[in-house]
Amino acid sequence: ISSRVSXLTIHPLRNIMDML
């Protein structure tokens, strides 16, 4: 479960970094 949540958190984080 922890691995799934990480991922989910990294997905939006990477999207925001790409926008910046």
Curated annotation (Swiss-Prot):
Single Gene Ontology MF annotation: aspartic-type endopeptidase activity
Disulfide-bond pairs as recorded: none
E.C. number(s) listed in UniProt: 3.4.23.-
Keyword terms of this UniProt record: Aspartyl protease, Glycoprotein, Hydrolase, Protease, Secreted
Subcellular location per the Swiss-Prot or TrEMBL entry: Secreted
Post-translational modification: Glycosylated.
GO cellular component: extracellular region
Domain of life: Eukaryota
Biological processes annotated in GO: proteolysis
Primary localization class, coarse: secreted
Record family assignment: Belongs to the peptidase A1 family.
Name assigned to this protein: Pregnancy-associated glycoprotein 57
Taxonomic source organism: Ovis aries (Sheep)
Lineage of source species: Eukaryota, Metazoa, Chordata, Craniata, Vertebrata
